[in-house]
């Protein structure tokens, strides 16, 4: 058995996974940027490893996280959306003496979708996780592209607006600054004067107010910015398909049909003959946990 851990920008998921990469048991909880969040995360990970280990032979612990994974030192640095400069997992390894494999969260989720989900029938594809930020994974000829330091292909940080809005990475005008679902939801809540609300309830409120001039403008701007970002991705990689994951999936009724229609209508790419298939992630929150142990 293996333990797959997905540390996202707003949640942590921990699963017990069998030899066929099927989840047997899982637990999920919300987290947020705050003081000492590193210690809280390590405590949660420690608790569930100990729990699963009591009745299972654990051969691997896979951890998918935003930031820069360093498997040599067992550290993850620059988890910017949680304000974590360095998350040190070496003590976990020394305590349990179980191999630990660190991966980028979006690349882990993309790998799971590529092998078992929405992208399994394609050889050339791009996975975009639109949530707290925009994470990405790129597949060419059936292989996940990896940069020299396992950090590259950060498509969320392609600049789509010169001197645009400030991004957490330090640059301005990044793709994720305009198209991360967190930003969209924040703007929608401000327009509708709503504070505490779930994503599902917020989507219903937006649907009810779809004729609201500001909401309609917000949706149009979001789709327009998404197409600009996608045009860069398509021109660079020429994928057969692009899969959207993250909370974008829960808002598909607002965006999906209109996005596909506008993509085919505008053909805002160098090669105007072929438009990649736009698909939605199938594994949802399970993808990161599964991909962490592949």
What are these regions (language model features)?
Residues 103-117:
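Conserved PLP phosphate-binding loop immediately N-terminal to the Schiff-base lysine helix
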Residues 105, 131, 292:
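Active-site glycine-centered loops adjacent to acidic/histidine catalytic or metal-binding residues
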Residues 1-60, 70-73, 90-100, 115-122, ...:
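ATP-binding/phosphotransfer module of carbohydrate and carboxylate kinases, centering on a glycine-rich
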Residues 74-85:
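A charged helix-plus-loop insertion that forms the helical arch/lid used to bind
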Residues 120-178:
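Glycine-rich phosphate-binding loop of actin/hexokinase-like ATP-binding domains
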């Amino acid at each position: 058995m293996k333990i797959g851990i997905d540390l996202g920008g707003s949640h942590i998921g921990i699963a017990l996974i069998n030899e066929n990469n099927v989840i047997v048991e899982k637990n999920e909880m919300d987290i947020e940027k705050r003081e000492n969040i590193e210690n809280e995360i390590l405590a949660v990970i420690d608790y569930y490893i100990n729990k699963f280990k009591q009745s299972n032979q654990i051969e691997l612990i896979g951890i998918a996280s935003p930031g820069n994974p360093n498997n040599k030192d067992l550290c993850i640095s620059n988890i910017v959306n949680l304000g974590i400069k360095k998350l040190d997992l070496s003590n976990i390894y020394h305590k349990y003496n179980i191999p630990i494999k660190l991966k980028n969260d979006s690349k882990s989720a993309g790998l799971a979708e590529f092998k078992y989900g929405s992208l399994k029938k394609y050889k050339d594809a791009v996975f975009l996780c639109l949530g707290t930020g925009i994470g990405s994974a790129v597949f060419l000829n059936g292989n996940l592209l990896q940069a020299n330091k396992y950090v590259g292909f950060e498509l969320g940080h392609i600049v789509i607006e010169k001197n645009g809005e400030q991004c957490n990475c330090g640059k301005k005008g990044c793709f994720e600054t305009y198209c991360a679902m967190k930003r969209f939801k924040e703007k929608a809540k401000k327009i509708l004067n709503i504070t505490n609300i779930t994503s599902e309830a917020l989507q219903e409120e937006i649907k009810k107010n779809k004729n609201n001039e500001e909401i309609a403008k917000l949706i149009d701007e979001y789709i327009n910015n998404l197409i600009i970002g996608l045009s860069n991705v398509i021109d660079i990689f020429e994928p057969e398909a692009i899969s959207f994951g993250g909370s974008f999936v829960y808002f598909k009724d607002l965006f999906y049909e209109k996005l596909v229609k506008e993509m085919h209508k505008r053909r805002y790419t160098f090669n105007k003959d072929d438009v990649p298939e736009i698909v939605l992630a199938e594994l949802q929150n399970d993808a990161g946990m599964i991909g962490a142990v592949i």
